[in-house]
Amino acid sequence: MSALTIYSETETREPLWHSTDAAEIADKLNARGVRFERWEADRDLGQDPAAETVINAYQHAIDKLVAEKGYQSWDVISLRADNPQKEALRAKFLNEHTHGEDEVRFFVEGAGLFCLHIDDQVYQVLCEKNDLISVPAGTPHWFDMGSEPNFTAIRIFDNPEGWIAQFTGDAIADAYPRLP
């Protein structure tokens, strides 16, 4: 179940707000410029699907986003618990960073935790299958896929080169709850 938990930048143990209601989550995030929507991820992808299979199954969703925002490229990130690079990838994504473009993800399997550092608050968004999130360009954030990752998401980019991060050097991510 998707969830949003909001923390103060200075108080990492007691949430200011929490909800698992998709409409409430969307309202809170939209007020901060973050797009959050529930889409249908209803295609049977089989076990450990190839990127091409995922793209073909959800080309209609990609086309919708491209038509809306003029995105130039897309790919698929799919990680499972048996991935030999899971620890290195988790460590990389857990560092607070920004992008020069929106970070758009459509989760078609599994879950991951986007943590957005907006002003003096941290918004932890548990994204699951059927969730579309678009983090605005320049928003400091990090992503936690957990110690045993299990997700597939379509990534949509303005930049044809794909995922390019500018790391902030802030260790704030270390202070907040993570996925197990």
From Swiss-Prot:
Annotated positions for site May play a role in metal incorporation in vivo: 96
Binding-site list for Fe(2+): 97, 99, 103, 141
Annotated cofactor note: Binds 1 Fe(2+) cation per monomer.
Pfam family, one: ARD
GO BP annotation list: L-methionine salvage from methylthioadenosine; L-methionine salvage from S-adenosylmethionine
Keywords: Amino-acid biosynthesis, Dioxygenase, Iron, Metal-binding, Methionine biosynthesis, Nickel, Oxidoreductase
Cofactor entry: Fe(2+); Ni(2+)
Cystine pairings recorded for this chain: none
E.C. number: 1.13.11.54, 1.13.11.53
Site (Important to generate the dianion): 105
GO MF term set: acireductone dioxygenase (Ni2+-requiring) activity; acireductone dioxygenase [iron(II)-requiring] activity; iron ion binding; nickel cation binding
Superkingdom assignment: Bacteria
Keyword Aminoacyl-tRNA synthetase belongs to the record: no
Stored PANTHER family: ACIREDUCTONE DIOXYGENASE (PTHR23418:SF0)
Entries under HAMAP family matching the protein: Salvage_MtnD (MF_01682)
Protein name: Acireductone dioxygenase
Organism: Enterobacter sp. (strain 638)
Lineage summary: Bacteria, Pseudomonadati, Pseudomonadota, Gammaproteobacteria, Enterobacterales
